Amino acid sequence: MTTENKKGYFGEFGGSYVPEVVQKALDKLEEAYNKYKDDEEFLKEYHHYLKNYSGRETPLYFAESLTNYLGGAKIYLKREDLNHLGAHKLNNVIGQILLAKRMGKKKVIAETGAGQHGVATAAAAAKFGMQCDIYMGALDVERQRLNVFRMEILGATVHAVEKGERTLKEAVDAAFKAWINNINDTFYVLGSAVGPHPYPSMVKDFQRVISQEARRQILEKENRLPDMIIACVGGGSNAIGAFAEFIPDKEVKLIGVEAAGKGLNTDRHAATLTLGTVDVLDGMKTYALFNEDGSVKPVYSISPGLDYPGIGPEHAFLRDSKRAEYVSATDDEAVNALLLLTKKEGIIPAIESSHALAEVIKRAPKLNKNKIIIVNISGRGDKDVAAIAEYLKNK
């Protein structure tokens, strides 16, 4: 099921707003993607590596202690944190790098915020013998030292971007610029369901495995579909992967949780769908956070994977068509959710995923015990432990 209504558009959102030189490269990418996305050999190889390299499928885990503590709906965790390298990112990276190989590319470039996509890209590049350059905002480099070191020992060159807010937006800009300068031999491995067509559709297809598994797993366990799917939203790749197979099931509520940072009434947040306006950002038409002069607003979140001032175009469409609902969680709510899951289930979730858990904590107690929530645990929290310790110390 796709909500794409004409090439590269979801309603009015999406498209490809890029210079001609980039459009030519995107046309070649789209051609290769269309050629291989239903190709039996390609899919066989892709699923082989998902199973044997990434360790899929990931469990759908009944969080019994958390369910009992909150006293309402049954809570299931989709354990994307158990993927190789600790997040959902590898689902997409394996697909894109296998595509790059078939296109004859020798080098890959990627942007990264929390570092998870960078680590996944560096690992897959090492596995498939490709040169790898990663662009990361200098502030994120400071926040995610361990992931930077991981990328480096995997053989990648990490470029710390010192411009602007020194976070994900600047990393995307720098990676894009580097790609344009080396467009013939380089493949841009985009980490989220954002950017110009065909990236949002391609990333969704490679992340769709999350909901393909979750749908089958919940039917096996409960003999029915869930009432609600909840996932955190930065650019939106884990959420679109978790939503994809459930979009046609109108009785299943889809809920995306953005970063409210220090609060929606401050300028320290990244709540794009809550407070953004429609314009062009990073080659796509979507909701984004802009100043009155048209410049992109600085965004903030405790979570380096959620501080992006835009949103994937399909999420913009799902919001406007009312198929999905988008809410937000503050830093405090996310940290409290992280600590609660850790104490109740012995699972340390990523601070990104903890935003989704914060919404579960709000909703589950208000629902009957026969209701079912699936929350996507998009990554594990090892990378965040030092930052959380610092955050709690300064409270």
From Swiss-Prot:
Cofactor: pyridoxal 5'-phosphate
Matches recorded under Pfam families: PALP (PF00291)
Keyword Cell cycle: no
An annotated GO cellular component: cytoplasm
UniProt catalytic activity: (1S,2R)-1-C-(indol-3-yl)glycerol 3-phosphate + L-serine = D-glyceraldehyde 3-phosphate + L-tryptophan + H2O
Pathway(s) per entry: Amino-acid biosynthesis; L-tryptophan biosynthesis; L-tryptophan from chorismate: step 5/5
Cross-referenced Gene3D superfamilies: 3.40.50.1100
Cleavable signal peptide: none
Keyword Heme among UniProt keywords: no
CDD domains according to UniProt: Trp-synth_B
GO biological process, one term: L-tryptophan biosynthetic process
Keywords assigned: Amino-acid biosynthesis, Aromatic amino acid biosynthesis, Lyase, Pyridoxal phosphate, Tryptophan biosynthesis
GO molecular function list: tryptophan synthase activity
SUPFAM superfamilies associated with the record: Tryptophan synthase beta subunit-like PLP-dependent enzymes
InterPro entries tied to this protein: Trp_synth_b_CS (IPR006653), Trp_synth_beta (IPR006654), Trp_synth_beta/beta-like (IPR023026), TrpB-like_PALP (IPR001926), TrpB-like_PALP_sf (IPR036052)
EC number(s) per entry: 4.2.1.20
Post-translational modification N6-(pyridoxal phosphate)lysine, affected residues: 89
Function: The beta subunit is responsible for the synthesis of L-tryptophan from indole and L-serine.
Protein family according to the UniProt entry: Belongs to the TrpB family.
Subunit structure: Tetramer of two alpha and two beta chains.
Protein name: Tryptophan synthase beta chain
Organism in which the protein naturally occurs: Fusobacterium nucleatum subsp. nucleatum (strain ATCC 25586 / DSM 15643 / BCRC 10681 / CIP 101130 / JCM 8532 / KCTC 2640 / LMG 13131 / VPI 4355)
Lineage: Bacteria, Fusobacteriati, Fusobacteriota, Fusobacteriia, Fusobacteriales
